[in-house]
């Protein structure tokens, strides 16, 4: 009986998390930044007018001193360029499951956080081409850096 209740509790917690943060509809993963070589990752989604989407990040990094970490995203709708935008991966609201440890000038930081949100203005095939940039920091180690789209 205890196992059944535990299983039910875990299931409800996971369902509740989706209700709070939204359903994942796309994910773009990075293992390194585009400071030397341009590394472009993309995802394409069929979106409808009025849908609300949000941009989240899942980060697990290690670095020394100061760091800036920015997603640069180019948007295409039905293969036509629409422009682009930038999002700071280190400034999220809300931030969830955060673990940040600093010792001296070395930091390890892991979290999930929301960076931005939109309401879709027209039906179409939306392509998000993303690049991850950082400030010059040769100590940066990316264990995980993912741009996650949810609705």
Feature-to-residue mapping (PLM):
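Positively charged n-region of N-terminal signal peptides that target proteins for export
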Residues: 1-4
């Amino acid at each position: 009986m205890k196992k059944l209740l535990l299983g039910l509790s875990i299931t409800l917690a996971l369902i509740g998390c989706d209700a709070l943060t939204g359903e994942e509809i796309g994910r773009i993963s990075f293992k390194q930044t585009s400071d030397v070589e341009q590394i472009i990752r993309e995802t394409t989604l069929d979106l409808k007018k009025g849908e609300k989407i949000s941009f989240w990040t899942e980060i697990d990094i290690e670095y020394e001193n100061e760091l800036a970490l920015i997603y640069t995203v180019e948007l295409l709708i039905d293969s036509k360029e629409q422009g682009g935008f930038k999002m700071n991966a280190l400034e999220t609201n809300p931030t969830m499951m955060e673990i940040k440890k600093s010792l001296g000038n070395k930091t390890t930081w892991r979290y999930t956080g929301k960076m931005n949100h939109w309401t879709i203005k027209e039906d179409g095939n939306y392509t998000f081409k993303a690049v991850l940039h950082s400030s010059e920091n040769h100590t940066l180690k990316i264990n995980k850096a993912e741009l996650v789209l949810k609705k």
